[in-house]
Amino acid sequence: MKSLLRQIPQISKVVEIFKKKYPEIYVVKAAREVAEKYRKEIIEGKRKDLNGFLEDVERKIKSLMKPNIKRVINATGVVINTNLGRAPLSKDVINFISEIANGYSNLEYNLEEGKRGSRIAHIEKYLNELTGAESSFVVNNNAGAVFLVLNTLAEGKEVIISRGELVEIGGSFRIPDIMKKSGAILREVGTTNKTKVSDYEGAINQNTALLMKVHKSNFYMEGFVEEVKLEDLVKLGHKYGIPTYYDAGSGLLINLKEFGISVDEPNFRDCISLGIDLVSGSGDKLLGGPQAGIIVGKKNLIEKIKKNPIARALRIDKLTLSGLEMTLKLYFEKRYEDIPVIRMLTQDEKALRQKAKRLEKLLKDIPGLKISVIKDKAKPGGGSLPELELPTYCVAIRHDRLSSQELSRRLRLAEPPIVCRIREDQLLFDMRTVFHEDLKTIKKTLQELLSI
């Protein structure tokens, strides 16, 4: 054993072998990790020789050199998959981001006047037009938007909100926690399942700064329930001269019912038309753009928010801003089909079945696979439209040698990774979230994995 341990190549010698081919920092790290692995296996009696040492080092080098964030093929059927990066961006958006990233830009420069300008001005006209708001502002995400609104308008003062709307918005971030950090004082009213206008009104006092509602975007309640309507909250706010604020969550810019999706999901324009003073939402959920926190509403309130020093800490960067501008431009031009999230949500069953049949045909010649096309249900995801199930078609496969769990694992570790779902020991590729251009990649990946 000692003799074999002494034969493990020195790190410096391994570096000499690979230094012309790979950056030294990766070679050193890979050589050390592989040497340690071999040393441990020899001591434990699991290894009797050093065969394959250099090959293992080179494989490790290549693995270390790959970026950690990878493009993933989403075959889960969850359209706004938070773990997989939420909304995929339009090709127009991607090209525009690339163009802006590839040099300098007029991010904060007024070309007409030749002096400093505002970065938000680039998208404000789109947001105001699309939502009907007097003014608008954008920060890095919607949790930041909620924090900024509360800190600006209610620091040291009370914010009245329904107990049933004190939601957790994911990643253990909870509305009460954000409110506490903002300096606002939580005044919860009503019960978990029932809150009335009288509950809000009964809690109003001289220290009340804001009447707030939060859209329950990631769950829904039914049965013996009641919540305060936005229009009633507006009337109450007007009666006492207190601003109203609605966290709409998903950032919807259109009426989904016009696209055949029968859900009562609030969109920015409808909320503003009801008279809510401020509305906020996410950029990378139902809106289908990059991550951002969008705030629209009354100009006097937005101006206060813009002047808050914390706004700079939550500032949106130029690439996100570029992506958001182009996404909003697509909405402005009514090019909804070019927005991937909207396109995926509104795909008809016939198109999904055709896509499934095409993948089935591509996979039929791969040995050992049992393939079928099945009808199933997909989900919007991203903490949006929790009650909605979308009809979809899946290609279901089962291998005669590998379990579905093992095949799923191998697909996740492939290049590019492919993430599916498993049901009844079948691997399902949901066509609602698989792009046409990914079908041949799925075939090629399965061929390579199953030929090993």
Curated annotation (Swiss-Prot):
GO biological process terms on file: conversion of seryl-tRNAsec to selenocys-tRNAsec; selenocysteine incorporation
Q: What is its main location?
A: cytoplasm
Pathway(s) where this gene product acts: Aminoacyl-tRNA biosynthesis; selenocysteinyl-tRNA(Sec) biosynthesis; selenocysteinyl-tRNA(Sec) from L-seryl-tRNA(Sec) (bacterial route): step 1/1
Q: Where in the cell is it found?
A: Cytoplasm
Signal peptide feature range: none
Q: Which GO CC annotations does the UniProt entry carry?
A: cytoplasm
The record's SUPFAM superfamilies line, in alphabetical order, gives:
PLP-dependent transferases (SSF53383)
- Report keywords, A-Z: Cytoplasm, Protein biosynthesis, Pyridoxal phosphate, Selenium, Transferase
Catalytic reactions of this protein: L-seryl-tRNA(Sec) + selenophosphate + H(+) = L-selenocysteinyl-tRNA(Sec) + phosphate
Q: Member of which family? A: Belongs to the SelA family.
Q: Tell me what this protein is called.
A: L-seryl-tRNA(Sec) selenium transferase
The source organism is Aquifex aeolicus (strain VF5)
Q: Which gene encodes it?
A: selA
